Amino acid sequence: MLRVLHRAASALVMATVIGLAPAVAFALAEPTSTPQAPIAAYKPRSNEILWDGYGVPHIYGVDAPSAFYGYGWAQARSHGDNILRLYGEARGKGAEYWGPDYEQTTVWLLTNGVPERAQQWYAQQSPDFRANLDAFAAGINAYAQQNPDDISPEVRQVLPVSGADVVAHAHRLMNFLYVASPGRTLGEGDPPDLADQGSNSWAVAPGKTANGNALLLQNPHLSWTTDYFTYYEAHLVTPDFEIYGATQIGLPVIRFAFNQRMGITNTVNGMVGATNYRLTLQDGGYLYDGQVRPFERPQASYRLRQADGTTVDKPLEIRSSVHGPVFERADGTAVAVRVAGLDRPGMLEQYFDMITADSFDDYEAALARMQVPTFNIVYADREGTINYSFNGVAPKRAEGDIAFWQGLVPGDSSRYLWTETHPLDDLPRVTNPPGGFVQNSNDPPWTPTWPVTYTPKDFPSYLAPQTPHSLRAQQSVRLMSENDDLTLERFMALQLSHRAVMADRTLPDLIPAALIDPDPEVQAAARLLAAWDREFTSDSRAALLFEEWARLFAGQNFAGQAGFATPWSLDKPVSTPYGVRDPKAAVDQLRTAIANTKRKYGAIDRPFGDASRMILNDVNVPGAAGYGNLGSFRVFTWSDPDENGVRTPVHGETWVAMIEFSTPVRAYGLMSYGNSRQPGTTHYSDQIERVSRADFRELLLRREQVEAAVQERTPFNFKP
């Protein structure tokens, strides 16, 4: 156990950022010595799953297929109902299995050819990896067969699942949620669980650490709802590889992964890998280069479950243009979607090869296959190499910036039809920079390290925007650039930063103006803000008021620039914006914020953690940390308050792991919402109190550690 207090972390961050000696000292273990080679991994002689006290499966397999089988079995035990539902959707049978609520998803996936393409992709896997996919599916089936009462009757019809189902789910998640989403194509915008995605990542080189060991932060921020973004923690060991980390349920490979030699993490990068084309309809077809072209119209249908349990066949009218499948928006606009990477069946195997690479060269060779369609990927290893890659399948475009390609692109001319994509070497990347770290917090790829090593002028303008970097992203750069001699403990403390950077940038102008306002309530609010330490801690009495003011000053998502005296500039990407352009207007906004805070929370000085609660099952504990656009590096997005002024997380920290590549590796982390959501589980709310206390648990890699913590053993036999 390693506990890091919120206040201690805040004090440490403040001290280091302003250049003072650290105000807090942690009880540290002796520095780990670093032999020339990592310790040998445990080599299993039998197949078994050892479950620790937090429901984490430590899966030991005599070979790769056995480990994948055990991993499928473990996922089914922990999340079986949800995985089967996701697999049923990816088959294009959600409407048939569960009715009209799934009809739009079914139409989206069938029109885009996901189930059919998944069958093709499955056949294109290498024989060895196809065997792993089959084994993973077999593990899911075996759990369901052995424990039929633990699987909801609603989803049993999906069984048995196949390796092709595994591919279909991964294909849907990556290519038709992350890269192309129905909301963007249909003009409805992304749903909150997709739009609010975010993550933090750091990799630190040995020269910037106290013990000469590289450090890595894995810290995805996603929706807390139960869906395709729910994370699962696991540990796989065979004689040939070891993988620890987390990934979305239903995936057979761990994307946020590490072992005794190396680790990787991912953040959403916003690469525009899909293009939505506005078609001009004419004479039953569409205009293209001055000619009317007919649509391709393949025959298709699907089944729809009725309220009485029967199903009916429904015809599906599919139209395809030269660009891709065509959809009709609510306003009648015909939109064709073209998705890059539909010729890349090897995403899962590439991830597996990346996280089992024996060297950075091997890792880069796997990355260069360009099968992973999107994401920033950050790497660190025991040899001291760190790397940031703005990864993804990026179309080569002859003209236009990213704003043009994010919108509706004219579909009546071949000048906008892309046919090629960029190789890895064309994309922004940094390896072992002079600053000694790489980072990304969903910012564009222009400040992956500090000082910067390239500029936007070095790349096509359609790759990434030159728009304001969020205050969270700016804080990420500052926390790394302004801190040296990092230990793992200090690294963990910095990860807990929940400073309101926007308060630092605005309160010096707002408070003096509010103090001279004739309204006593405004003056009292100004004094409250002046006494605030500008941290989103549970005992803060001004944080809720500031949040309400910032919502008026910078907009509902806290990202507006108009109110600042000095707007964001690419020339000063981590110190702008700042100042208040119109102090009088800002004071009027404070006046409104006072009323809003009272209405929502009962008082302007209600403690932050009294209103912001971590509630799962019967656990109800105070929360800390805030919105990333306010500058909090540790992120929680809160629901609207209820009638009692209480709100809970809807998005934010899910999996967090901090790794030191010592010998042996040391790692600490948490899965905020627990490691299982299957009915009857005891591992849904069992980590939330630790989240509230910032009490990270040690992640157990060595066999002796696992044996000391084991709560249950599951031996298994696997025969392909």
UniProtKB/Swiss-Prot annotation:
Keywords: Antibiotic resistance, Hydrolase, Periplasm, Signal, Zymogen. Pfam families: Penicil_amidase (PF01804). One of its GO terms (biological process) is response to antibiotic. GO terms for molecular function: glutaryl-7-aminocephalosporanic-acid acylase activity. It catalyses: (7R)-7-(4-carboxybutanamido)cephalosporanate + H2O = (7R)-7-aminocephalosporanate + glutarate. Its EC number is 3.5.1.93. Induction: By glutaric acid. Residues 190-198 form a propeptide. Its main location: periplasm. It is found in: Periplasm. Belongs to the peptidase S45 family. This is Glutaryl-7-aminocephalosporanic-acid acylase. It comes from Pseudomonas sp. (strain SY-77).
